[in-house]
Design a protein with these regions (language model features):
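Metal-coordinating catalytic core of metallo-dependent amide/deamination hydrolases
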Residues: 2-126, 131
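Active-site-adjacent C-terminal substructures of enzyme catalytic domains
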Residues: 117-191
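Non-catalytic positions within long, well-ordered alpha-helices that form the structural scaffold/packing
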Residues: 1, 56-57, 150, 187
Length: 191
């Protein structure tokens, strides 16, 4: 399978998705194309977000979002809740780019886990990409978060080369501290 993240925003034409799903069907015998609507999480609290989720329900699209600190925890939780409820309603998967940061370690995953717990939803397939700021937490904190993630069946995709390029980079020196998801610790927690 090839998963592609398509930048998505309010007011964007639905036509792009119709064309992408035509391509998906055209090549389905040779290749599985997975499309993620990568949007600000507040997008899923709009009529455009609801309409796109409906279209995705019959085409296998994936709801996507970006959660990177600093952010307003209350608003982020509200928008994540809407996204989770849409995914539950339309039987969709979620793909989040989360904690791709060198500040506020684990802030995004903590809000996600708290929101899932408050909604009492456990059956939504969720993939979290990056999680690079977790490396700044203590080993115990990583293992505790990992256990909660495993309990909710949250999958993690580490993107070390992307994070090496995006985070803590300087034109004058090579940083000795480049955050990357703590995969070994998360694996100990069965993530």
């Amino acid at each position: 399978a090839i998963r592609s993240h398509i930048d998505t925003y309010k007011g964007q034409s639905i036509d792009i998705w119709i064309e992408l799903f035509k391509l998906q069907k055209k090549f389905s015998s040779e290749l599985t194309l997975q499309y993620v609507a990568l949007a600000p999480v507040e997008f899923w609290d709009t009529t455009d977000g609801e309409d796109l989720a409906k279209i995705f329900s019959s085409n296998g699209g994936i709801l996507g979002g970006v959660i990177v600190p600093p952010f307003n925890k209350k608003n982020t939780s509200k928008f994540l809740a809407k996204m989770l409820l849409l995914a539950s309603k339309y039987k969709l998967e979620i793909d989040l780019h989360i904690d791709e940061s060198i500040i506020e370690p684990g802030a995004g995953i903590k809000v996600l886990l708290e929101t899932i717990e408050n909604l009492k939803i456990n059956s939504i397939p969720i993939t979290c990409s990056h999680l690079s700021s977790l490396i700044s937490l203590s080993n115990r904190e990583i293992l505790n978060l990992g256990e909660k993630m495993a309990e909710k069946n949250i999958k993690v995709i580490a993107l070390p080369l992307t994070n090496f390029w995006l985070l803590n980079r300087s034109n004058k020196t090579t940083s000795l501290k480049r955050p990357v998801a703590p995969i070994k610790q998360l694996q100990k927690s069965h993530v």
